[in-house]
C-alpha cells in the first residue's frame, strides 16, 4: 500500500477505500453479510451455545420434568382443551353424550339434544311429540340448574325445546296423507 492511501476500515476489503470506493457486490456482498451475521451471533452468544449442543449430541432432557417429556393421552387432551379455551364446548359435548344419565332414560327416549349455541349459551332439544315438548318445557328450569351444576355456573342460560315438526324437522308439508288446510306435523295436536 502507498503511504498516501488510507487504511481500509472495518468491513472493507483491501481493494476498497474509505473515500467512496466501489460498493461490494456478488460474492463480496455475501461475505460482508456473513461476517456481519457472525459478529452479531458472537455478540449474542449463540455460537457458543450451538457448539455445546453439538458436542452433547443435541438437546437432551435432564433429570427434572419439562414440557418435552412424554405424557398420558388424557393429560395431553386436557392440556390442549385448556390451552385453546375449549372447556365449555367440550363439557357440553360430554353432556350430550351423557344425556340419558342427566335427564333419565324415559325423557331421553323422547327428547334429544340437537346443538349448543356457545354465544347465547342455549341448549336446543328436539322432542318426538308435543306432549313431551310441553313436559320438557316444564322441567327446563330444573334441568338448567342441574346442567350448570355439572358444567359450571352460567354455561347453559336457557333450554330451547322444539317440537317434532319445528324448523328443520321431519314434519310433512305435502303428500297424499296430508289433509288440505291442516297445520300440524301430524302429531298429537295440530
UniProtKB/Swiss-Prot annotation:
Pfam families in alphabetical order: DciA
Coiled-coil regions, chain positions: none
Signal peptide range in chain numbering: none
Family: Belongs to the UPF0232 family.
Taxonomic placement: Bacteria, Bacillati, Actinomycetota, Actinomycetes, Kitasatosporales
Protein name as it appears in the record: UPF0232 protein SCO3875
Biased segments, Gly residues type: 163-172
PANTHER family: UPF0232 PROTEIN SCO3875
Biased composition (Low complexity): 26-35
Top-level taxon of the source organism: Bacteria
Biased composition (Basic and acidic residues): 36-45
